[in-house]
C-alpha cells in the first residue's frame, strides 16, 4: 500500500468549536477515533496534519504520527497538500478530523473507487436519506449525483427540490455528503493551485472549486453513520448517538 497515504487534517483553531478534535467521545478524543478507523482500513500510512503543537503532543500519546503545518493554510486540503507534497505516494486520502464515526470500509471503498476509475480526479462518499430535518440542515451538505455517481453539485441548500410529491418522487432519496476525499496526487496539486471559486465562496464548500474547474468527482454510497462534529450541538448529538448505538 506504499502508493497511498491517509492524512487527517486536525485544526486546533476551528471556528465554530475551538479544539473540537480534542473533545472526548466514549473515552477517546475525536481525532483518535478518526485515526483508529484509518489504521483499521489498512490502506497505507496514516498521518495527522495540524497547525498546533498541542495536537501533535496529544496524538503522540495514542501512538499517532502528526506533523506541524503552517498556520496560514486556508483549508484542510491546503494542509494535507503541505504534508504530502514531497512524498512519493500517488493517492492521497483526506479524512476530516471531525468525522469520528467514519468506518474503515468507507475508507477502503473510496480508495478502491479512486484507483479503479482512470477518468476521475476525486473520489468521495455519500449516504441516502429521507429525513427532512437532515435535508434542510445547512450543516448537512447535499450532493446531486448522476446515475453513475458523478457529482453535479454540492450545496448547503435543500436540493434537489421535489416540485411535485408523487409516489415516484417520494421514493427518490436525498444524498448527504461525508467528509472524506480521495485525490489522485496530480489532482490534489491542481486543486490547491486554483484560486477559491465563486461558488465555493458563496457556499463555503471547497469541493465546488474542483467542480467549477471541470474536475470529475465520483462517489460511493454508504450507510448513514453518526454525525460529523461542527458545533457544540453536534457534539451533544454525537454523545447521544454513542449512548444509543
UniProtKB/Swiss-Prot annotation:
It is an enzyme of class 2 (transferase). Keywords: Cytoplasm, Lipopolysaccharide biosynthesis, Nucleotidyltransferase, Transferase. It catalyses: 3-deoxy-alpha-D-manno-oct-2-ulosonate + CTP = CMP-3-deoxy-beta-D-manno-octulosonate + diphosphate. Pathway: Nucleotide-sugar biosynthesis; CMP-3-deoxy-D-manno-octulosonate biosynthesis; CMP-3-deoxy-D-manno-octulosonate from 3-deoxy-D-manno-octulosonate and CTP: step 1/1; Bacterial outer membrane biogenesis; lipopolysaccharide biosynthesis. It is found in: Cytoplasm. The keyword Metal-binding does not apply. Its EC number is 2.7.7.38. GO terms for biological process: CMP-keto-3-deoxy-D-manno-octulosonic acid biosynthetic process; lipopolysaccharide biosynthetic process. Belongs to the KdsB family. This is 3-deoxy-manno-octulosonate cytidylyltransferase. The gene is kdsB.
Amino acid at each position: 500500500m506504499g502508493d497511498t497515504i491517509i492524512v487527517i487534517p486536525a485544526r486546533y483553531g476551528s471556528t465554530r468549536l475551538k479544539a473540537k478534535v480534542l473533545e472526548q467521545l466514549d473515552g477517546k478524543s475525536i481525532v483518535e477515533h478518526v485515526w483508529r478507523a484509518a489504521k483499521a482500513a489498512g490502506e497505507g500510512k496514516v498521518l495527522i496534519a495540524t497547525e498546533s503543537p498541542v495536537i501533535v503532543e496529544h496524538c503522540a500519546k495514542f501512538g499517532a504520527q502528526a506533523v506541524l503545518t503552517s498556520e496560514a493554510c486556508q483549508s484542510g486540503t491546503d494542509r494535507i497538500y503541505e504534508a504530502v507534497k514531497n512524498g512519493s505516494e500517488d493517492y492521497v486520502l483526506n479524512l476530516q478530523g471531525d468525522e469520528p464515526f467514519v468506518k474503515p470500509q468507507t475508507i477502503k471503498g473510496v480508495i478502491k473507487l479512486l484507483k479503479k476509475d482512470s477518468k476521475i480526479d476525486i473520489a468521495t462518499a455519500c449516504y441516502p436519506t429521507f429525513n427532512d430535518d437532515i435535508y434542510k440542515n445547512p450543516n448537512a451538505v447535499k450532493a446531486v449525483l448522476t446515475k453513475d455517481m458523478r457529482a453535479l453539485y454540492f450545496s448547503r441548500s435543500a436540493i434537489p427540490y421535489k416540485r411535485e410529491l408523487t409516489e415516484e418522487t417520494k421514493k427518490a432519496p436525498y444524498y448527504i455528503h461525508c467528509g472524506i476525499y480521495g485525490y489522485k496526487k496530480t489532482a490534489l496539486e491542481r486543486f490547491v493551485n486554483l484560486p477559491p471559486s465563486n461558488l465555493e465562496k458563496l457556499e463555503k464548500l471547497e469541493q465546488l472549486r474542483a467542480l467549477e474547474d471541470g474536475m470529475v468527482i465520483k462517489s460511493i454510497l454508504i450507510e448513514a453513520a453518526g454525525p460529523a462534529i461542527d458545533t457544540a450541538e453536534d457534539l451533544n448529538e454525537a454523545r447521544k448517538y454513542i449512548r444509543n448505538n
